[in-house]
Every structure is written in C-alpha cells, then in structure tokens.
Amino acid sequence: MNDRPAEETTIGEAAPAEIAEARPAHIGEPAPAEIAEARPAQIGEPASAAARPDLLADRLPYRIARPYRVRFEEATANESMRTAIYLAWAADIAWQHSTELGFGREWYAERGLFWLVRAIQLDVLRPIPTYAGMLVSTQVLGYRRVAARRESDVRDPSGELAARLLIDWVMTNERGIPTRVPADFLKFVAADTPAIEMHKVALPAAPRDAFERRFHVRRRDLDPLDHVNNSVYVDFLEEALEGAGQGDLLRATPRRYALDFAASAARGESLTGRAWPQDGGWAYRLSREDGTEVFRARVCRL
C-alpha cells in the first residue's frame, strides 16, 4: 500500500477534487448506501414519538439500523464503552449495509476494489454503560469522484442520540490507487446531494515537551488485511492522552475526535506517538521511526 503525502486541509475545509495517492487506511469493508444532509450532533438529542420509528427502522436502500450490545471486554474501568468500539460498530454496519445492497466481499474481490477509511469525525455525546443495548444506523451522505462519506448514529432504544460519526472513505484498486466510484452506486444517491468536503487534520510540529510514547505494533492490533485496524489507532491516541494526564478529557461528554489516517502501520513496526495541548484540546501525531506520519488526531470538549 502506498503512503500518501500529508495534505494541509483541516476538518471542514475543501479537499482537492481528487486524491493524488492512496490513503492506506484500515477497514477493507465497503462503504455506501443512503443520503441525508450532514447535521451537527446535538447533545442528548431526543427523538420525538413520531420520529422514533423512522430513526430506528431501516429505510432501504438508503439506510439500515442494527442492534449492538456493549460487551464486558469492550468497556473501560469506569464502566463505559471504549471509544474505539464506536469505530468498530460503524465499520461493521457499513459492511452489512453494502452486502444487503448486493455489494458483498465477493463483488469487491472480483473487481479488485476496496474501501479504505480516510478520516473520521466522532462526537461522543454521552457515555454508554457496560452491557447496554444500542441501535447503530448507517447511510451515505454523498460521493466525490473517488470517495464517499457515511454517517452513523448510535442511539439508545428510545431513539436518544449518544454518538455520531462522519466517516470519509476512499475507493482504491488492488494496487492501492484511488479509483472512481462505480456508477452502480450512484443510484443510491439523491440528485440534490451536496458536495462533500473531505475531512483533514493539519497539525503543527510537536513541541519539545510533548508527551512521547514509543511502542511496537502487536499481533492483536492487526486486522484481516494484516495492518493496524483503524479503531486501534483510537486506543493508541487515548493511551497517550491518559499518559499525559488527560483522563478527565477522555471521560468528558460531549467531546469530539477528529481522526486522520495518513498511512497504514504494519505488523511489528516501531511507532512513536506524541501528544500535546492545542487550541483548548489535545493534538496527537503517530509516526514511524523515519518520521513518516501514520495518524493525526485532535480531541476536544464540545
């Protein structure tokens, strides 16, 4: 997989019309399927009685919702779900949705196509306790020439919003080169869908007193593509922030994560993570021994 040079485009700013190189990222699962306008997450957003059936039900081909449960090993010592699990749920339901639409793993394998995660914005609005049952939805908000954006909401059984993820995916061929989204996918997109602006986290150089953590990629960090799964980068990020004394930030709600996957880390690689305070929140950069950026992130209270 080829590494992509860093682009200095911040979250919310427009990205280039097309991505020059592959953004090796992480879950090889497909992405697409519904359209809706992107909207900011509201704290504890209640669902009206009339809206609840729609929020919690499928609207094929555009959206599906599925039940998930927080397992014991997915919770932290304070009895709330680990942040990384939001990403795992969102990737899993995206795969389920694509499969229901007829674009399963066999379809992608026959064509040598892959969906790779480029960037994620995650708003955690309230903690989810151990063993809680939740409903996770997925839909496609729009496409660029080689990319798609999905939105996933995490709601309790009453319809109250607990978290929202905006996930930018890039379609690549078997060589890791970005390629056009097949025309077959466009029939799931409304004609008036607004153009999406690809998310990006741009960071300055880390200060000399930044918290630093060096480690190697472990076997348990790898996914079926034999590189670090994108949800694991959130664990790396939070381990660094906790080491820097920011445990309160990781427990705060609401809070926002801006995540930018610059390259993929492989089995046994030596990595260095640096974390430092920035603009009222905390910044994080993960790099290889040669200085190549692998992952960039920001975390802040909302």
Q: Across the structure, where does each feature detected by a protein language model lie?
A:
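Hot-dog-fold acyl-thioester-processing enzymes
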Residues: 2-5, 44-117, 164-166, 172-255
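Charge-rich, low-complexity terminal tails
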Residues: 241-276
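Small beta-barrel nucleic-acid-binding modules, principally OB-folds
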Residues: 112-127, 252-264
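Long, intrinsically disordered low-complexity tandem-repeat segments
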Residues: 11-47
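HotDog/MaoC-like acyl-thioester-processing domains
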Residues: 2-4, 44-48, 53-55, 60-66, ...
